[in-house]
Amino acid sequence: MAISKVWISLLLALAVVLSAPAARAEEAAAAEEAAAPEAVLTLHADNFDDAIGQHPFILVEFYAPWCGHCKSLAPEYEKAAQLLSKHDPAIVLAKVDANDEKNKPLAGKYEVQGFPTLKIFRNGGKSIQEYKGPREAEGIVEYLKKQVGPASKEIKAPEDATYLEDGKIHIVGVFTEFSGPEFTNFLEVAEKLRSYYDFGHTVHANHLPRGDAAVERPVVRLFKPFDELVVDSKDFDVSALEKFIDASSTPKVVIFDKNPDNHPYLLKFFQSNAPKAMLFLNFSTGPFESFKSAYYGAVEEFSGKDVKFLIGDIESSQGAFQYFGLKVDQAPLILIQDGDSKKFLKEHVEAGQIVAWLKDYFDGKLTPFRKSEPIPEANNEPVKVVVADNVHDVVFKSGKNVLIEFYAPWCGHCKKLAPILDEAAATLQSEEDVVIAKMDATENDVPGEFDVQGYPTLYFVTPSGKKVSYEGGRTADEIVDYIRKNKETAGQAAAATEKAAEPAATEPLKDEL
């Protein structure tokens, strides 16, 4: 299970003291910028397709007027649009109010799950990619300039390959000629992954700074600043090539410390859906070397397993401790989060126990643990408190229509929403088939049925199990109106449940080959 974007940000933010923000622009420049006409195109349902068709490359932000992150992005987005309007060719930035009723079909079509969502449209919308770049103007500009050019650049001379030694990950295809299925597949993968890596291609392996110059071609060569430094693959199947790049571009053991050079690998580690094994201990104490040796040995022993490994310093990993519900006095500890969001913990682990404990995990012998606050003894407020240990009972098994908020205590938007939810819940208190609930997502594991990428996140769940991300208004009246319009009665819930069960009851048995 991948960790939500907001938590990944916190994990990394707590690992290093962030530098002070850049100096502000002078007032005269700011005034001049404010007076300039808006460079960001405003799109809506009536002009969206035409705009996408007119521009070979366009970045579109799907936003909501009430979204705090959208408001923070707006001036940076506009500044980037103004700077990129001078680029040759011009790079276009646009925005869509996805909260507007007439634009909601667009949000649905392009799978907008939260705000802001940014997508790159190429070639009239034939290619659509998530924007994975920075959120400040200068970063947006540099990122998009790279995205506009070819996905892979030809290396014609040794001087063209000097960038391969810059300490980043690069992928180079070595071919006898720039044609054929292998080259086509390579370019397809380069286009798909260009947001993450730099790609190059050449017919001269001897131009490259590392690797066998006499290698049989075609071959894909990945350069990296860790482990083997260079690794080759001859499998040009698109799926196999993507897997090769994914597996080779992360260290065998990701290090969680204050070194910012490790943060890109941490980001990729926590975004991965693969099972994750994490050893947390104090890097500055004597036993560290023996633990490190034992852990790296275990990584080699289980190298054939589908699991990613991390070793983290306690001091740098407080965000991870908070996310996983761990305590410093449990260290040294080893934790596994599997692809189904289950977690397995061994606290006070000894170096000599690591291999055996991992073997027990792979053999299915371990019992999962879950982060949960205690179930409230009294729960008499209009908005009901739910925790990980009772969320399924309250939300999915109560037979009621439930609006549930996932929040963080430190979140300003959550604090503003709290009295509004209280008011809405009080208004609906006499309607016994309705519950408004809240869960502190920093103290409880969020069930896998919900995708929580930021705070607050709200879902509406009906008695029949229908689950919808709530993207409606943020006033008490709007929330009440939404619930009353969308709730199921007992009869509707029974009918929906019966209808959902019909295919399973009538579908003939099939033999699976």
From Swiss-Prot:
Site (Lowers pKa of C-terminal Cys of first active site): R135
Keyword check for Signal: yes
All residue ranges annotated as the Thioredoxin domain in the record: 26-149, 369-488
Subcellular location: Endoplasmic reticulum lumen
Enzyme nomenclature, EC number: 5.3.4.1
Positions of short motif Prevents secretion from ER: 510-513
Signal peptide: 1-25
Compositional bias per record (Low complexity), positions renumbered to this chain: 491-507
Record InterPro entries: PDI_thioredoxin-like_dom (IPR005788), Prot_disulphide_isomerase (IPR005792), Thioredoxin-like_sf (IPR036249), Thioredoxin_CS (IPR017937), Thioredoxin_domain (IPR013766)
Classification via Pfam families: Thioredoxin, Thioredoxin_6
Lowers pKa of C-terminal Cys of second active site (site feature) positions: R474
Catalytic residues identified in the record: C67 (nucleophile), C70 (nucleophile), C411 (nucleophile), C414 (nucleophile)
Disulfide bonding pattern of the chain: C67-C70, C411-C414
One Gene Ontology term of the molecular function aspect: protein disulfide isomerase activity
GO biological process terms on file: protein folding; response to endoplasmic reticulum stress
Site (Contributes to redox potential value) location in chain: G68, H69, G412, H413
Predominant cellular place of this UniProt entry's protein: endoplasmic reticulum
Entry function: Participates in the folding of proteins containing disulfide bonds, may be involved in glycosylation, prolyl hydroxylation and triglyceride transfer.
Similarity remark: Belongs to the protein disulfide isomerase family.
Protein name stated in the entry: Protein disulfide-isomerase
Taxonomic placement: Eukaryota, Viridiplantae, Streptophyta, Embryophyta, Tracheophyta
Gene: PDI
